[in-house]
């Protein structure tokens, strides 16, 4: 359910684009993200860092798109977000010995202790590489295809690739998970 809730602004962006174009869709995405953040705060009295980053990104890139009447900015927003995530994962692991994937998932998953550090490191690198790739893919779709193709890719293509990556990661992780003794 959280996954669908996280898609709320993207789905509304897609629908608004189909009825009103890129500028109306951008405004709808900005408003939807604000509403989403307010709802999360109302329900949990807390907003996590990734939600703040997403809000700031949509407000900055969306505002530039609207005020300069140039859709290039909204086309670049996913790449900026993907590369920010990629960079944070990579730099924090390589230079600060902080594995954000382990921080986010470590309480839910217990790995076999013999090689847990290596597995978490590989998983962190895989996510960093995935986000880096997605940033380039977004640029390619945004500037080599029509705006409508990019909008379709933003909802269906990038979401589909994310789901496929999570499933593949799940299969890979299943070999390394410690199962409780029965």
From Swiss-Prot:
Upper taxonomic lineage: Bacteria, Pseudomonadati, Pseudomonadota, Betaproteobacteria, Burkholderiales
Highest taxon listed in the record's lineage: Bacteria
This protein's UniProt keywords: Cell inner membrane, Cell membrane, Membrane, Transmembrane, Transmembrane helix
GO cellular component: plasma membrane
Membrane topology value: Multi-pass membrane protein
Family: Belongs to the YciB family.
InterPro entries: YciB
Protein name: Inner membrane-spanning protein YciB
